[in-house]
């Protein structure tokens, strides 16, 4: 059972000065820039939080969905959607080095890009159910655990081998899956049920709360959104933090429709349907 309590100490909530209406796709691990996209995840733009300068990384559809940033903040990995003459959707996985501007095609257009993860030297990719490792730049590729979704089922790839995880059963659909920062736990959302955490082998699955779009704040804390809709429009949403034992704290007020959080140590950033962005500064 969840209970309300203190999870994080909110020191301030600051509105980000955006060049135009946008949604936040990611915050850098160092907290010095945001990646922005549109409300439909089209395009990807870097916004420097210190000076407000922008750098367009992509104008393609889906570029703002499921963006990954390397731990040093230098490499951005994203996918672009395209359509062939039969109107079939394809995904191309790309990376760009923000320092040099060099870009790489990591996976050529495919119908079955299921998941990818980034560490300091490589990108682990699951495509058509098969795992591959792509080095970033000249670094040697490592073997990452990679979470992916295949036909609604939660999969995990460890040491190059992919297996079904789906801890709550095959009859459910899964989304918003991510590894804890220490790589020992899996966070996921079970459609229409709530947010759960389990071990890498799928054991010890436990419900954390009903929040959606969950992300890790640290190894023992998650952040998500509690949104309410009338079947067509979202009319209210707050950002919440929760410990793994289910203690939950609401971080934002009812005056803002706060959605889709992204978190690093000390900062949580969220977007609003009006195209605004805010940063919640927190301590533990």
Regions found by a protein language model. Give the residues of each.
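Sequence signature of WD/YWTD-type beta-propeller architectures
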Residues: 5-284
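C-terminal segment of classical bacterial N-terminal signal peptides
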Residues: 1-3
């Amino acid at each position: 059972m969840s209970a309300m309590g203190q999870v994080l100490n909110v020191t301030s909530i600051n509105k980000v000065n955006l060049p135009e209406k946008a949604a936040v796709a990611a915050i850098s691990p160092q907290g010095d820039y945001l990646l922005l996209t549109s409300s439909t995840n089209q395009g990807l733009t870097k916004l420097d939080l210190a000076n407000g300068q922008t750098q367009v990384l992509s104008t393609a559809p889906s570029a703002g969905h499921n963006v990954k940033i390397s731990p040093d903040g230098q490499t951005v990995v994203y996918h672009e959607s395209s359509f062939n003459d039969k109107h079939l959707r394809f995904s191309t996985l790309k990376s760009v080095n923000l320092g040099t501007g060099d870009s790489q095609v990591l996976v050529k257009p495919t119908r079955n890009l299921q998941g990818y993860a980034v560490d300091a030297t490589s990108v682990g990719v699951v495509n058509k159910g098969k795992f591959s490792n792509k080095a970033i730049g000249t670094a040697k590729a490592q073997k990452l655990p990679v979470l992916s979704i295949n036909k609604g089922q939660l999969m995990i790839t460890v040491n190059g081998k992919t297996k079904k995880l789906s801890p709550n059963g095959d009859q459910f659909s899964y989304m918003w899956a991510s590894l804890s920062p220490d790589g020992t736990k899996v966070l996921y959302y079970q459609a229409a049920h709530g947010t759960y955490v389990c071990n890498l082998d799928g054991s010890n699955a436990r419900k954390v709360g009903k929040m959606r779009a969950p992300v890790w704040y640290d190894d023992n804390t998650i952040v998500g959104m509690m949104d309410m809709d009338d079947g067509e429009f979202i009319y209210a949403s707050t950002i919440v933090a929760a410990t793994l034992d289910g203690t939950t704290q609401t971080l934002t007020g009812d005056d803002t429709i706060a959605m889709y959080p992204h978190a690093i140590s000390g900062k949580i950033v969220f977007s609003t349907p009006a195209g605004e962005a805010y940063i919640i500064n927190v301590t533990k």
